[in-house]
Structure formats: structure tokens, C-alpha cells
């Protein structure tokens, strides 16, 4: 166990590429905490945007003290090794809300109302602070304990930010299945985007699955355009009215925050109480009006990990919404903050258990990342006196109203400016060489021909740039998908034929495991999902080979599923089997077999093993998110490619040798 200040780090309960979360406890009080350990140097080196998100998370959590919001109690760092910071956070033993929904399948309307009231009260507090969350989903809602009536708490503020209620943002963030349509379409959006996410969460509580479910952004956009959601008839009319009001694609028609808080079904304004985790009752109105001077004082000690002005660190003195119950609900949560920013991927980067000689409050860490941006606070762009002026990276991320020229328009988000369309003419970039005047005068006719050729070339370049822009946008959308979804788009899967080959390679692994239905079925499903992702709305336009293979493996899947015993229908009986791990292990095994065949000069067989292994690794490369995992798979792919090229070359040489030998023999 490792000691950090007055806290002991015990069991690791979550990890990611840049941070880990430990179960910990206070040496003085023995209270449990979740301690998030962040490698800020590695984080900044990898992506400056992630550094900003960490700053926002700490800045926002510092401002918040509420029953229905996960608390940040302290931020520490080691004096001798400032590489890491330690975020001392509230520990929630009940896990995340998605696990609760999966366990209970569909919630009763009464239980859904119980949780929705708590979510609404937490969001009402955020609205009072002018904070938009931007990544609301069940995985980011935590439960205080495993009791019948746990307290729901909003967590993971990595994407959250302070925002003017009427300002627009064009930052693309959040989880697509819970993301508002205006964000998916990369349009400017307001605080109403969170209301869509609330509607999807409420729908999932009552129905057991998200209103729109897809493995790719294009398909999700298609569903939003064509699919109409239907609610079970047993849901009350008031509840149905709220869901339909929240899930309005047109932002103007979507319910407002004020109307949401005052909605008849939620009934937040009455004095009805609902039970808490201890079996007691607490009033809805008390949630937002409890004061606790001790917790408020704790917040004043919390500072930012990365080069932040500390002039306004006492902004919390204006916070009159603190809660008395926070310290009474700190329990060990093996899932707490597991979905926090940068904590979604498996990474064994941290293994150092040495105790530091000294730990102190991180009032001014020795980092100077993006220092120029921190000076923007001197500008008087913000007309809203309620928004803190000390927010880090204030204007380079469009936090609130600033001069129009400082806000990048969404239409030029990924657009190259080397050629810009200005009406009927094409204006060259001012730094282009073609802007220079020529000293030799050409004949008029020759000049006209030359100008026409240049215009044609410029138009072609412009079309290519527009196509590249669309491809980049599509790729960016897909990479933001949740890790448990298969990421399939035109950038990653180069062609229908390549998808077909990858799917068949996975399906053939299933063929080898037909005697183990619990392993065969997941592999078939994976292969069918892969093929289906490339079948257009009109299947008749697909190659016969593609459709026939899809149909054949679907038939095999149904046959195995229907003829096997009931255990195959309950994956919990064989939960240790991981299709992706099985694919990874077999890819490496194919590499070994290919190498053996290559040693014996069996080049055709060796090439087949290398090809199958490459296809499996390409599939894994298309779904993996963790940077370390990506690097490992990339190295294997490069090694397979090298051996494949050598095998092909040796195979051609061996064939030529045989031909030459036969030719000599014939001549003699």
C-alpha cells in the first residue's frame, strides 16, 4: 500500500491510458475514498485537449457540493515527483447506473421517477452554476451503495464546462448513443443538448435499452432521421409526454430546462419526499439548500494541476448549495470513476508503490502548458458576471461569448484554406507562390488558355479537399464511439471486399469451435455484425458472394443456437470467454504457424497463415482505443507485412528456379 499525504492507496479499482483509480482511505478518519492518480506529463505530451479536460474537471468539481454530484475533496501532488497528481474523490459503492439497469432490466415507472428526480435535482444545481455536462449517460451516473434506494450522483466532468445559457458551442464531445442530434451533425449547440441525453437515459430506464442503438455514426444518423420511437402502453401519459418532449430532434421544439424542472411527471416543486439509502426520507427541496461550511472550506484548498491562475480560488464562497450528507455516503466503489476521462482503457503503466517523502497541496505545480492561453482572462469578452474569469484556457475553447472572429465556424472546422471559394471566383491563399506577378508577358490567347487550365486544376484540387474533409469528419465521428461498440466506417474498413475477408477469418475461427457453442456463437455474431455493417439498405446491390456468405453463417448461428443446450443462451455461464482476446491469441498463433511453414519453404501455406493473422489484427486495430494497445497491434501488423512480402518474394524465386530447372532439362 502507498501513502499519499493523509491517505492510503489500497486496491486498484480502475485504470486507463493516463490515470488509475484506487480504493483508498483516510489515515485520520478511516473514511473510504476513490483516489484518481493522473500522469499529467504523459497526458499533456499525448494530447493537449485531454489536459484541458482535466483542468475543467477539477475546476468544475471544485465549484460543486451537492448530494447528487460526486465530490472532489482534495488535489495533491508529490514534492519530489510532480509527474502525478492525486484527486481525492467521493467513493460510490453501488457502481455505475448502467450496471444497475442491466441487472434490473426494465425499471418500474416508480423506480425510474425515484432516480430521475435525483438526476433532475443534480442538473438543476448545475444549471444554477451555468455548467453544461455534455456527456450524460448511465456509465457516468454513480450510485452511493447497493441498497434498495441508493443515491444517484452525477460524475465524470471531463467534458463539462461553464457556458452562457444562450451561447453556442461547436465542440464535438460525448457518447454518440446519448448525444444530441445537433452535436452528431456537428452543428452549434446550446445547453439543451443535455436534455436530449436525459431523455435517452429515461427511455433506457423504462425500456431496458437506448432509444437509438447502432454500431456506427452514419447508421445512427439514419435512425434519427427515419426511426420513430415507441413507448410501452403501460407508461403513464405524463411520463410519455416528458420523454417525447425531451427527444425532439428540432432543438426549438425540445422542452426547455425550466419546463423540464416544472414538468407534471417530475413534480419537483411539491413537498413529496422519497426514500434515501438509509431508509429515511429526504425532501426534494432540501437537496439544493443544505449548507456545510466544512465542505466549503475544503474546496478552497483545491487547486488546478496545470499552470492555472489562482487569483479567484475562493469563488466557492458564493456557493450556497452545499450538502450535509456527502461524508456519510462515502463507500468503496469498485467502479467509481471507471468511466472518467482517460480511464476507459486497460493500461498497466503504473506499478510504482514507493511512498513519497512529502506530499503537499498543489497550489502551483511546476507546469507551464499552454501558458499563453491562460493570459486570455484579462480580456473583457464575457458580459456575464456569474461566469468565473479564472477559468483555464478560457477563450481558445470557446467557453463563453467572445468576439465573432475568435470563434471558428463549424463549416471550416476541417477545411483547408489553401483554396477558398469566394462566390464565382477562386481566391488563392495569400502565401501561395501563384500570387506572385510574372515579369514576362504572354500572348493574350496563351494567357487565357493558361488561366483556364489553372482554374480547372484548382477546381479539381478543391473537390479533392472537400472529399478529404468529409472523410476526416466521418472518421472523427466514429473514433468517439464507446469502447464496447464495433467501430466500422469507410475510413477504417477500406472496402466491402476487405470487410468480407475479415469477417470470414473471424467466422472460420467459429467453425473451429463448433464443439464449444459458448465460444462459437459470439464469434459468429461478431462476423455477422462485421458483414452487416457493409450491407447497404438495398442488399441487391451487394455481390452475391457477400450475401450468400452472410446468409450461410446466419443459418449456422441459428442452427447452433437452437440445437444447443440452454447454457448457450446465458453468457454468464461462460463469461470468461472473450471473443476479442480469442481473436488476438489466434492471430499470433497464425503468425507462429506461418513462420514454421516458411522455414520449411512451404510458402503458399505460410502466406495463408500470415494473411489470416493480418485480417484478424486489422479487425482488432479498428476497434481498439487504448494507445498502447494500438501500438502493439501496429507492430504485429508491420511484422506480418514484412514476412508476407519476404514470403511472396521467396515463393516467386522458387517458382522461377523450378521453371529454369525444367527448361534446362528439356533442352538437354
Curated annotation (Swiss-Prot):
Record GO terms (molecular function): ATP binding; enzyme activator activity; protein kinase activity; protein serine kinase activity; protein serine/threonine kinase activity
EC id: 2.7.11.1
One GO CC annotation: Atg1/ULK1 kinase complex
GO biological process, one term: response to bacterium
SUPFAM superfamilies: Protein kinase-like (PK-like)
Broad class of where this protein is predominantly found: cytoplasm
Region feature Disordered, mapped onto this chain: 281-389, 402-447
Active-site residues annotated for this sequence: 135 (proton acceptor)
Reaction catalyzed: L-seryl-[protein] + ATP = O-phospho-L-seryl-[protein] + ADP + H(+); L-threonyl-[protein] + ATP = O-phospho-L-threonyl-[protein] + ADP + H(+)
Disruption-associated phenotype: Impaired survival when exposed to pathogenic bacteria S.typhimurium associated with the accumulation of S.typhimuriumin in large vacuoles which fail to undergo autophagy.
This protein's UniProt keywords: ATP-binding, Autophagy, Cytoplasm, Kinase, Membrane, Nucleotide-binding, Protein transport, Serine/threonine-protein kinase, Transferase, Transport
Subunit structure: Homodimer. Forms a ternary complex with ATG13 and ATG17.
PANTHER family: NON-SPECIFIC SERINE_THREONINE PROTEIN KINASE, SERINE/THREONINE-PROTEIN KINASE UNC-51-RELATED
Similarity comment text for this entry: Belongs to the protein kinase superfamily. Ser/Thr protein kinase family. APG1/unc-51/ULK1 subfamily.
Role description: Serine/threonine protein kinase involved in autophagy. Involved in the control of autophagic vacuolar cell death. Required for normal survival when exposed to pathogenic bacteria S.typhimurium by promoting autophagic degradation of intracellular S.typhimurium.
Protein name in the entry: Serine/threonine-protein kinase atg1
Organism of origin: Dictyostelium discoideum
Amino acid at each position: 500500500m502507498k501513502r499519499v499525504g493523509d491517505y492510503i492507496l489500497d486496491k486498484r479499482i480502475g485504470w486507463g491510458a493516463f490515470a488509475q483509480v484506487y480504493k483508498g482511505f483516510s489515515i485520520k478518519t478511516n473514511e473510504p475514498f476513490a483516489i484518481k492518480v493522473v500522469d499529467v506529463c504523459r497526458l499533456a505530451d499525448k494530447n493537449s485537449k485531454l489536459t484541458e479536460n482535466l483542468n475543467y474537471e477539477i475546476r468544475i468539481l471544485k465549484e460543486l457540493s451537492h448530494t447528487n454530484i460526486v465530490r472532489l475533496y482534495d488535489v495533491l501532488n508529490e514534492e519530489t515527483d510532480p509527474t502525478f497528481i492525486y484527486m481525492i474523490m467521493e467513493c460510490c459503492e453501488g457502481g455505475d447506473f448502467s450496471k444497475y439497469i442491466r441487472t434490473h432490466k426494465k425499471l418500474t415507472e416508480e423506480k425510474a421517477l425515484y432516480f430521475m428526480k435525483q438526476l433532475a435535482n443534480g442538473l438543476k444545481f448545475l444549471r444554477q452554476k451555468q455548467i453544461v455536462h455534455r456527456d450524460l449517460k448511465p456509465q457516468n451516473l454513480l450510485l452511493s451503495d447497493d441498497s434498495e434506494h441508493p443515491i444517484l450522483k452525477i460524475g465524470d466532468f471531463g467534458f463539462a464546462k461553464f457556458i452562457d445559457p444562450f451561447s453556442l458551442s461547436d465542440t464535438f464531445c460525448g457518447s454518440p448513443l446519448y448525444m444530441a442530434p445537433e452535436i452528431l451533425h456537428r452543428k452549434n449547440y446550446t445547453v439543451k443538448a443535455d436534455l436530449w441525453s436525459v431523455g435517452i437515459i429515461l427511455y433506457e430506464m423504462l425500456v431496458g435499452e437506448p432509444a437509438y442503438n447502432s454500431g456506427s455514426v452514419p447508421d445512427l444518423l439514419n435512425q434519427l432521421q427515419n426511426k420513430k420511437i415507441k413507448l410501452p402502453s403501460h407508461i403513464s401519459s405524463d411520463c410519455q409526454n416528458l420523454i417525447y418532449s425531451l427527444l425532439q430532434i428540432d432543438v426549438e421544439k425540445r422542452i426547455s430546462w425550466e419546463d423540464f424542472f416544472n414538468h407534471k411527471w417530475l413534480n419537483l416543486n411539491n413537498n413529496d419526499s422519497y426514500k434515501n439509502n438509509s431508509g429515511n426520507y429526504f425532501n426534494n427541496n432540501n437537496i439544493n439548500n443544505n449548507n456545510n461550511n466544512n465542505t466549503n472550506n475544503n474546496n478552497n484548498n483545491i487547486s488546478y494541476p496545470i499552470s492555472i491562475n489562482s487569483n479567484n480560488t475562493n469563488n466557492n464562497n458564493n456557493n450556497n448549495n452545499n450538502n450535509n450528507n456527502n461524508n456519510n455516503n462515502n463507500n468503496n466503489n469498485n467502479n467509481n470513476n471507471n468511466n472518467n476521462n482517460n480511464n476507459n482503457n486497460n493500461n498497466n503503466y503504473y506499478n510504482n508503490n514507493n511512498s513519497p517523502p512529502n506530499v503537499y497541496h498543489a497550489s502551483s505545480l511546476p507546469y507551464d502548458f499552454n501558458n499563453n492561453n491562460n493570459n486570455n482572462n484579462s480580456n473583457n469578452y464575457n458580459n456575464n458576471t456569474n461566469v468565473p474569469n479564472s477559468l483555464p484556457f478560457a477563450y481558445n475553447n470557446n467557453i463563453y461569448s467572445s468576439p465573432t472572429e475568435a470563434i471558428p465556424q463549424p463549416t471550416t472546422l476541417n477545411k483547408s484554406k489553401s483554396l477558398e471559394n469566394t462566390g464565382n471566383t477562386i481566391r488563392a491563399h495569400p502565401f501561395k507562390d501563384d500570387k506572385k506577378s510574372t515579369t514576362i508577358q504572354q500572348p493574350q490567347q496563351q494567357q487565357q488558355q493558361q488561366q483556364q487550365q489553372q482554374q480547372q486544376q484548382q477546381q479539381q484540387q478543391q473537390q479533392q479537399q472537400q472529399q478529404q474533409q468529409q472523410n476526416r469528419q466521418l472518421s472523427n465521428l466514429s473514433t468517439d464511439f464507446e469502447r464496447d461498440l464495433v467501430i466500422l466506417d469507410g475510413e477504417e474498413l477500406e472496402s466491402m471486399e476487405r470487410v468480407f475477408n475479415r469477417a470470414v477469418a473471424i467466422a472460420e475461427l467459429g467453425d473451429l469451435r463448433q464443439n464449444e457453442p459458448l465460444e462459437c456463437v459470439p464469434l459468429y455474431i461478431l462476423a455477422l455484425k462485421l458483414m452487416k455493417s457493409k450491407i447497404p439498405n438495398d442488399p441487391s446491390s451487394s455481390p452475391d458472394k457477400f450475401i450468400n456468405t452472410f446468409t450461410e453463417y446466419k443459418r449456422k448461428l441459428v442452427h447452433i443456437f437452437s440445437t444447443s443446450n440452454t447454457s448457450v443462451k446465458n453468457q454468464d455461464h461462460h463469461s470468461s470467454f472473450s471473443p476479442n482476446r480469442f481473436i488476438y491469441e489466434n492471430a499470433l498463433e497464425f503468425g507462429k504457424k506461418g513462420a514454421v511453414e516458411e522455414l520449411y519453404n512451404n510458402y503458399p501455406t505460410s502466406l495463408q497463415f500470415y494473411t489470416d493473422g493480418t485480417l484478424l489484427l486489422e479487425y482488432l486495430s479498428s476497434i481498439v482505443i487504448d494507445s498502447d494497445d494500438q501500438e502493439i497491434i501496429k507492430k504485429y501488423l508491420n511484422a506480418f507485412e514484412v514476412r508476407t512480402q519476404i514470403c511472396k518474394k521467396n515463393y516467386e524465386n522458387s517458382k522461377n528456379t523450378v521453371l529454369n530447372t525444367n527448361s534446362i532439362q528439356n533442352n538437354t
